[in-house]
């Protein structure tokens, strides 16, 4: 994915000149990917992204600690998968100006951003997104995440979405429309600081895979799954493994007729 001339070179400082503004790329995929020595990136304001449709892996495995991309024109972008993945040094990320109304793929967008302490995505229009799998995988420093405004009506894939978000104590998914969701395996695996999780709005009628979905949620005190329709589920293996703080769990309504494991 990182097919650029400066790929993985030990660049510490990168400057975009004003003259570069005349260039209007259609893809910035992998542009700064693998620059794991980079500590300074200047002149991003001279990068015209108005024609860009593909930003996958753009800052993947990059050593930058702060990124302000609030000025980016992302109105044409459809692909943001792995855009910031494995950028383990990133502590601050400003995406407040992002128009993601055309984006369909957010797979692993923030995967491995293990130093990110806060993330404001309240302005995100996710109405076209179909894949959110691994989106926040390994964001182990995030303590709260409000995704209540996310439109997930087209999303089929949410597996590993919050995998190993170990510091997360507040997670708001109250606006989630999961009518098309088929994959939610390991969705909350390793969210060991969550004491509560409200999934009362979840429609699971199309879900096939629920294995390890709550595995390792060691602080979870209660879990109400009364609304869960499991009639299509084929896999439930290790679904509640390690949920050592749960004192009661009512699964009497679960339809397990299709379950194989």
Where are these regions (language model features)?
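Predominantly recognizes leucine-rich repeat
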Residues: 112, 137-138, 163-165, 189-190, ...
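Register-specific detector for alpha-helical tandem repeat solenoids, activating on a conserved position
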Residues: 29, 56-57, 81-82, 107-108, ...
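Structural signature of tandem-repeat unit edges
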Residues: 9-23, 37-53, 62-78, 88-104, ...
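Alpha-helix C-terminal capping segments
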Residues: 6-7, 59
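Extracellular beta-strand-rich solenoid/capping regions of secreted or surface-exposed proteins
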Residues: 2-6, 23-33
């Amino acid at each position: 994915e990182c097919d650029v001339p400066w790929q993985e070179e030990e660049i510490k400082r990168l400057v975009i000149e004003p003259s570069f503004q005349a260039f209007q790329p259609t893809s910035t995929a992998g542009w700064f990917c693998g620059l794991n020595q980079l500590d300074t990136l200047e002149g991003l304001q001279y990068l015209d992204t108005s024609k860009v449709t593909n930003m996958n892996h753009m800052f993947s495995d990059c050593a930058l600690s702060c990124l302000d991309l609030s000025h980016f024109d992302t109105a044409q972008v459809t692909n943001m998968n792995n855009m910031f993945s494995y950028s383990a040094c990133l502590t601050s990320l400003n995406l407040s100006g992002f128009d993601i109304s055309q984006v369909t793929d957010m797979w692993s967008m923030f995967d491995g951003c293990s130093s990110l302490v806060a993330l404001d995505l309240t302005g995100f229009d996710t109405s076209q997104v179909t894949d959110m799998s691994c989106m926040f995988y390994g964001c182990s420093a995030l303590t709260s995440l409000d995704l209540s405004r996310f439109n997930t009506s087209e999303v089929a894939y949410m597996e590993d979405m919050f995998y190993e978000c170990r510091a997360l104590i507040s997670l708001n998914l109250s606006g989630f429309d999961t009518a098309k969701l088929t994959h939610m395996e390991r969705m909350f695996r390793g969210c060991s600081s969550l004491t509560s999780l409200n999934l009362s709005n979840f429609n699971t009628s199309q879900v096939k895979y629920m294995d390890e979905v709550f595995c390792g949620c060691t602080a979870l005190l209660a879990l109400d799954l009364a609304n869960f329709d499991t009639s299509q589920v084929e896999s439930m293996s290790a679904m509640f493994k390690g949920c050592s703080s749960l004192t009661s769990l009512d699964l009497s309504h679960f339809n397990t007729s299709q379950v194989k494991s």
